Curated annotation (Swiss-Prot):
HAMAP family: LeuD_type2 (MF_01032). The lineage of its organism: Archaea, Methanobacteriati, Methanobacteriota, Thermococci, Thermococcales. The gene is leuD. The keyword DNA-binding does not apply. It catalyses: (2R,3S)-3-isopropylmalate = (2S)-2-isopropylmalate. Belongs to the LeuD family. LeuD type 2 subfamily. Disulfide bonds: none annotated. Transmembrane segments: none annotated. Catalyzes the isomerization between 2-isopropylmalate and 3-isopropylmalate, via the formation of 2-isopropylmaleate. This is 3-isopropylmalate dehydratase small subunit. One of its GO terms (molecular function) is 3-isopropylmalate dehydratase activity. SUPFAM superfamilies: LeuD/IlvD-like (SSF52016). PANTHER family: 3-ISOPROPYLMALATE DEHYDRATASE SMALL SUBUNIT, 3-ISOPROPYLMALATE DEHYDRATASE SMALL SUBUNIT 2-RELATED-RELATED. Pathway: Amino-acid biosynthesis; L-leucine biosynthesis; L-leucine from 3-methyl-2-oxobutanoate: step 2/4.
Amino acid sequence: MITRGRVWRFGDNVSTDTITPGRYNLTKDPEELARIAFIEARPEFSREVKPGDVVVGGRNFGIGSSRESAALSLKAAGVAGVIAESFGRIFYRNAVNLGLPLLVGDTSGLRDGEVVEVNWRTGEVRTENGVFHFKPLDGFLLRIVEEGGILSFIARRGDLCIE
C-alpha cells in the first residue's frame, strides 16, 4: 500500500464539523460528501484534491460529533489516508471501518502542498526533505483497511475471525 500525492495540512483539533459542516451534511451520497469536505476551512479542497493526496493534521484530528460522513467524505474525495499526531477515537474507528488508512506521529516535518510517498503498511513517508517514520495501524486494523473496510472484510471472510 504505497501512494503518492500532495499534502493538505491542517492544524490541531480539526473537528468532524470542520471536515463536513453540519449545515451541508444532509446526504449519505459519497460524491456529495466529497464536494463538502473542508468546504469552510479550505474551500478549494474539493476542486483541487487528487486521488492519492494525503490529509495531515496535528493533535486530535477528527474530534467532535460521531460523523461517519467525515471519514467518508475524505475517502470519496480520493484522499489516500490521514496522518496526524493523534485522532479522535470515533473518527479513527470510522476511518478504519471505511478503509481509510491512518498513521500516527510527529507531523511537523510535513509541509502543506509538498508531494509525499507514503507506505501505509510500514509508516514510512518520503518527502523531498527526507524520510519520516510514523506508527502504522496494527495488524488486524490494517487488514480491515486493506480489504476496503469492515463490510468488505466481513463479506470476504464471513465473520471477524482474525485467524
